[in-house]
Design a protein with these regions (language model features):
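Active-site catalytic motif of lipid deacylating hydrolases and related acyltransferases
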Residues: 1-49
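Short, hydrophobic beta-strand segments that form beta-sheet elements in well-ordered domains
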Residues: 53-57, 73-75, 137-143, 262-264, ...
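Gly/Ala-rich beta-loop-alpha elbow adjacent to hydrolase catalytic centers
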Residues: 56-66
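The alpha/beta-hydrolase serine catalytic core
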Residues: 72-186
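Non-catalytic pre-domain segments flanking phosphatase-related domains
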Residues: 184-199, 316
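Asp-based phosphoryl-transfer active-site loop
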Residues: 192-212
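Short, acidic loop-to-helix structural element flanking the phosphoryl-transfer center
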Residues: 207-231
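C-terminal cap/substrate-recognition subdomain and adjoining C-terminal extension
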Residues: 240-316
Length: 316
């Protein structure tokens, strides 16, 4: 189920995008009434009727989605303080719908009284942040969003708060590389699906100068479709700066898929998984119980060689 943003409709490009990129999914969406109390009531009725596996809300829709308790939800750049956003960005007075609506209405008026109504509705956010809800709610926040800045507020109440590279509006890159990974995590949990685990050394992704190894990000994204990936980095014994550097680099290069998938370990051979990808120059501390793929070796000179290996395992 998709919940659209301010001055939008169920006919938005995001609905088309979700249907195109997730062709097996049944996507439901509806035009939200301009009156916020009517809008919230309509959405609550809709979730009871549709019983969606997942709700995705963007911007103002993220504010509404937060209040649809009991369902798995992804809030993308949620305007959790929509009344403040409206006042700060000229969303008061005569407005034009950005997408066609079923009733054919093209314009609407936002009055000061209506802004107050939105403020009343936004104050209902965070009414239930119980342990059960913690696992239902994910927040994704664009690091270049010029309109909404609610990461601090969201993270005061929920633990799954994640930055992604992007601005306020959804596009193909944001949906593919930031939203779909979270959808995959939620879907795996709902279906109790256990993927094979691949540990990847940070030094297999990052070169000595701090840049990306050739084709590393492309390979990571391709592997992510099939495997549960974890990045392994050395754990500094006397300083936490090294951990912060790794987290910063992964946030910049890998982004959302690195969230909660970083392991700091000086004895990676003790990790329990199916595959370990590491540079061939690494001195082994012992025998990893799974399969070790050594990047830079005669067998796997490049990431492209590694990417030829995995499809063969599945008979492709």
């Amino acid at each position: 189920m998709y919940v659209h943003g301010f001055a939008s409709s169920a006919n938005s490009g995001t609905v088309t995008r979700i249907r195109t990129m997730l062709p097996s999914a049944i996507v439901v969406a509806d035009d939200i009434p301009v009156d916020p109390h009517e809008g919230l009531a309509m959405l609550r009725s809709m979730v009871e009727r549709e019983q969606p596996d997942l709700i995705i809300g963007t911007s103002m829709g993220g504010m509404y989605t937060e209040q649809l308790h009991g369902f798995d939800r992804i809030l993308v750049n949620p305007a959790l303080r929509i009344a403040d956003t409206m006042g700060a960005h000229g969303m008061v007075g005569k407005q034009t719908f950005q997408n066609p609506r079923k009733d054919g209405v093209q314009e609407f008026i936002v009055t000061k009284a209506m802004v107050k109504e939105y403020r009343d509705v936004q104050e209902q956010c965070f009414a239930d942040t119980s342990e059960a809800e913690q696992e239902h709610v994910w927040g994704l926040f664009g690091d270049e969003d010029p309109l909404v800045h609610t990461y601090p507020l969201f993270s005061e109440h929920y633990r799954h708060a994640i930055w992604f590279h992007g601005e306020h509006r959804m596009n193909d890159d944001i949906f593919l590389n930031s939203v779909i990974p979270v959808i995959r995590w939620i879907d795996d949990r709902q279906n109790k699906k256990e993927r094979q685990v691949v540990f990847i050394s940070i030094d297999a992704l990052r070169d000595k100068n701090g840049g990306q190894q050739p084709s590393a990000r492309k390979a990571f994204r391709q592997l992510l479709e099939t495997y549960n990936l974890f990045i392994v980095a050395p754990s500094p014994n006397y300083s936490g700066d090294g951990c912060a550097d790794v987290q910063s680099w992964l946030k910049d290069v890998i982004s959302v898929p690195a969230y909660d998938h970083i392991i700091f370990a000086n004895q990676p051979q003790l990790l329990l998984g199916d595959f370990l990808i590491q540079p061939s120059a690494v001195n082994p501390h012992g025998s990893f119980m799974g399969t070790v793929l050594e990047l830079g070796s005669d067998t796997f000179k490049t990431w492209d060689d590694i990417m030829e290996y995995f499809p063969r395992l599945n008979g492709h």
